[in-house]
């Protein structure tokens, strides 16, 4: 039986794609950006997309769109906006309204009561204000929840994973916070790739890491491409302007 998930802060659906490959289907997606919502509707035509600010969207509305009741959904996933914790930004953390959106994610988790949840964010979240943000999130996520005469509690753990360690040609570290109410201990995956000097070594379990993939490994077989318009030549400055407008 296909497992169902609720997707929060869905963006263009990248995180959903990963979970679809793992056998899940998205029962409902919640996203504020209109362009991202159009992309979600194009790529997931059978999935309800709720377009709007999550702070004004009740969990009941989300559950109704997903056609489930509390306790019936398998998974809640999401990557709340990370600018307030990013090492590239001003790092206002929980003092920034965007930083507080991690609590909106947990609000939906606590009211929808999925079997499990996965939240992704930038590595900077761990160290913000000497770990106070992470401590607050872990504490909130671990609080007992009473529903229909019963009490539920999530076992929560976190770990920093680097995309390069799993065959992606990019060094991209992210913290993953995982919780489940099934009484199970979650095991984070072990790296499959590493630096060339480590890739030649065999660990204690007889496992040999593959060498990191490079951009050349990923795209060298693609045919040469020419930008279809002058727009590509202006992207760099456009990105700089967008970064400036987002508080960096």
Swiss-Prot record:
Gene3D superfamilies: Vaccinia Virus protein VP39. It catalyses: a 2'-deoxycytidine in DNA + S-adenosyl-L-methionine = a 5-methyl-2'-deoxycytidine in DNA + S-adenosyl-L-homocysteine + H(+). GO terms for molecular function: DNA (cytosine-5-)-methyltransferase activity; DNA binding. Transmembrane segments: none annotated. GO terms for biological process: DNA restriction-modification system; methylation; negative regulation of gene expression via chromosomal CpG island methylation. The active site is at residue 82. Coiled coil: none annotated. Pfam families: DNA_methylase (PF00145). It is an enzyme of class 2 (transferase). Residues 3-248 form the SAM-dependent MTase C5-type domain. Keywords: DNA-binding, Methyltransferase, Restriction system, S-adenosyl-L-methionine, Transferase. Its EC number is 2.1.1.37. It comes from the Bacteria. Belongs to the class I-like SAM-binding methyltransferase superfamily. C5-methyltransferase family. NCBIfam families: dcm. Corresponds to the N-terminal half of the enzymatic domain. Heterodimer of an alpha and a beta subunit. This is Type II methyltransferase M.AquIA. It comes from Picosynechococcus sp. (strain ATCC 27264 / PCC 7002 / PR-6). The lineage of its organism: Bacteria, Bacillati, Cyanobacteriota, Cyanophyceae, Oscillatoriophycideae. The gene is aquIMA.
């Amino acid at each position: 039986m296909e497992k169902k998930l609720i997707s929060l802060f869905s963006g263009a659906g990248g995180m959903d794609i990963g979970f679809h490959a793992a056998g899940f289907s998205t029962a409902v997606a919640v996203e504020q950006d209109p362009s991202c919502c159009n992309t979600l509707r194009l790529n997931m035509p059978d999935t309800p997309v709720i377009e709007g600010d999550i702070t004004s969207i009740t969990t009941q509305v989300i559950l109704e769109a997903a056609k489930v009741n509390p306790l019936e959904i398998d998974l809640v996933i999401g990557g709340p906006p990370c600018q307030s914790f990013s090492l590239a930004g001003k790092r206002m953390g929980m003092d920034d309204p965007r930083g507080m959106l991690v609590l909106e994610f947990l609000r939906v988790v606590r009211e929808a009561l999925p079997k499990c949840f996965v939240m992704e964010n930038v590595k900077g979240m761990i160290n913000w204000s000497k770990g106070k943000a992470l401590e607050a999130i872990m504490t909130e996520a671990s609080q007992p929840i009473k529903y229909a005469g019963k009490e539920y509690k999530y076992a929560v753990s976190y770990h920093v994973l680097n995309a390069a360690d799993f065959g992606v040609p990019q060094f991209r570290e992210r913290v993953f916070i995982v919780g489940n109410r099934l009484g199970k201990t979650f095991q984070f995956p072990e790296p499959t790739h590493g630096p060339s000097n480590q890739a030649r070594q065999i660990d204690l379990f007889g496992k040999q890491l593959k060498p990191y993939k490079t951009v050349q490994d990923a795209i060298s077989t693609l045919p040469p491409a020419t930008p279809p318009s002058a727009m590509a030549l202006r992207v760099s400055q456009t990105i700089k302007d967008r970064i400036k407008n987002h508080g960096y």
